[in-house]
């Protein structure tokens, strides 16, 4: 999860987030090289006498500054498109969970079970226990099995919301009258926090998301107790 004064992204907990981190580093390196080149050229212009101020034609230079940006854009676009298509893949999910956004809480329904559904509200600050996180804890966590492909169906009952968990690389809009879907798979157990990421009203900041990823045996025990 995030920590104070953090400069980078959250630690990756899913294959998709790993890919996004690699793409971030790849793009950041390209930006760094371009910025270094521009700063070098500016420093030369400020410290040396300008030459070729009356040049009317420079075919070689024009060719370079046309082709080079095109190559750079291709180097950014190709890995970006690859990840985009990976995020849209649905590969035989082991479990489906339907998520509905409300003003201002989330409701969850495990569609593979006959009667497993609940609402998830933020715990008020005055009711937090020692060690719990302000504005991030909920009364009912979403318990899911780790190392399994899970499909999330996401929609809204009222206004636009967005269901986001940064460490899993997830952000899907919850739109009234429309059912969006995404997949997730956590590679290790733990608690993963997120929040509504679309301004949805006065209590937009009070719609946290908590995923509790557990081994399959623990999930089966939990689901048996909940049904």
UniProtKB/Swiss-Prot annotation:
Mg(2+) binds at residue 198. InterPro entries: CcO_II, CcO_II-like_C, CcO_II_C, Copper_CuA, Cupredoxin, Cyt_c_oxidase_su2, Cyt_c_oxidase_su2_TM_dom, Cyt_c_oxidase_su2_TM_sf. It catalyses: 4 Fe(II)-[cytochrome c] + O2 + 8 H(+)(in) = 4 Fe(III)-[cytochrome c] + 2 H2O + 4 H(+)(out). Binds a dinuclear copper A center per subunit. Residues 46-59 are mitochondrial matrix. The chain crosses the membrane at residues 15-45, 60-87. It is found in: Mitochondrion inner membrane. It is a multi-pass membrane protein. Its cofactor is Cu cation. Its main location: mitochondrion. It comes from the Eukaryota. Residues 1-14, 88-227 are mitochondrial intermembrane. Signal peptide: none annotated. Its EC number is 7.1.1.9. The modification Phosphotyrosine is found at residue 218. GO terms for cellular component: mitochondrial inner membrane; respiratory chain complex IV. It is an enzyme of class 7 (translocase). Keywords: Copper, Electron transport, Magnesium, Membrane, Metal-binding, Mitochondrion, Mitochondrion inner membrane, Phosphoprotein, Respiratory chain, Translocase, Transmembrane, Transmembrane helix, Transport. Cu cation A2 binds at residues 196, 198, 200, 204. Cu cation A1 binds at residues 161, 196, 200, 207. Belongs to the cytochrome c oxidase subunit 2 family. Component of the cytochrome c oxidase, the last enzyme in the mitochondrial electron transport chain which drives oxidative phosphorylation. The respiratory chain contains 3 multisubunit complexes succinate dehydrogenase (complex II, CII), ubiquinol-cytochrome c oxidoreductase (cytochrome b-c1 complex, complex III, CIII) and cytochrome c oxidase (complex IV, CIV), that cooperate to transfer electrons derived from NADH and succinate to molecular oxygen, creating an electrochemical gradient over the inner membrane that drives transmembrane transport and the ATP synthase. Component of the cytochrome c oxidase (complex IV, CIV), a multisubunit enzyme composed of 14 subunits. The complex is composed of a catalytic core of 3 subunits MT-CO1, MT-CO2 and MT-CO3, encoded in the mitochondrial DNA, and 11 supernumerary subunits COX4I, COX5A, COX5B, COX6A, COX6B, COX6C, COX7A, COX7B, COX7C, COX8 and NDUFA4, which are encoded in the nuclear genome. PANTHER family: CYTOCHROME C OXIDASE SUBUNIT 2 (PTHR22888:SF9), CYTOCHROME C OXIDASE, SUBUNIT II (PTHR22888). This is Cytochrome c oxidase subunit 2. It comes from Canis simensis (Ethiopian wolf). The gene is MT-CO2.
């Amino acid at each position: 999860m995030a920590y104070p004064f953090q400069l980078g992204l959250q630690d990756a907990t899913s294959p998709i987030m790993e890919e996004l981190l690699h793409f971030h580093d790849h793009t950041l390196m390209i930006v760094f090289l371009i910025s270094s080149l521009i700063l070098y050229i500016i420093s030369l212009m400020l410290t040396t006498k300008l030459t070729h101020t009356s040049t009317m034609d420079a075919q070689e230079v024009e060719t370079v500054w046309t082709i080079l940006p095109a190559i750079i854009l291709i180097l950014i676009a190709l890995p970006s498109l690859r990840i985009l298509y990976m995020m849209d893949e649905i590969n035989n999910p082991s479990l489906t969970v339907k998520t509905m956004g409300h003003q201002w809480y989330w409701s969850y329904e495990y569609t593979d079970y006959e009667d497993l559904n609940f609402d998830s509200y933020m715990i008020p600050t005055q009711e937090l226990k020692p060690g719990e996180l302000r504005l991030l804890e909920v009364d009912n966590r979403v318990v899911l099995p780790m190392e399994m492909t899970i499909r999330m169906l996401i929609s809204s009952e009222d206004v636009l919301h967005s269901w986001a968990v940064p460490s899993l690389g997830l952000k899907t809009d919850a739109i009234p009258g429309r059912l969006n879907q995404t997949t997730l798979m956590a590679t290790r157990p733990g608690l993963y926090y997120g929040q509504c990421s679309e301004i949805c009203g006065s209590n937009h900041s009070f719609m946290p998301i908590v995923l509790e990823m557990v081994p399959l045996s623990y999930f089966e025990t939990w689901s048996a107790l909940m049904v």
